């Protein structure tokens, strides 16, 4: 029997998301679904010395658009998010390895949709 898993792409997903992918024979990103503001597609929480902190990609409401249609904004959010990860996990084991994995996606300005950005991050792991 073939195991198929289908999910919307998430921004910096939790461990269980990767377990879902690993346990499936076929994984499908379902990014034709409607984008919903203030959801895991464009934000996530990280924990640092000061407690939980939201990291949100400022994409706006994008009412009526699918996840794959949401355009990434210009601005400093990419470098700010990388710096937030670096600062909050500076003393964590393997932080440099993690930054080596995710930095190319954050630095690639040709990735201009939320769906492509999230999928690129997920595929790097």
Regions found by a protein language model. Give the residues of each.
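Residues lining hydrophobic/aromatic ligand-binding pockets adjacent to catalytic sites
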Residues: 1-124
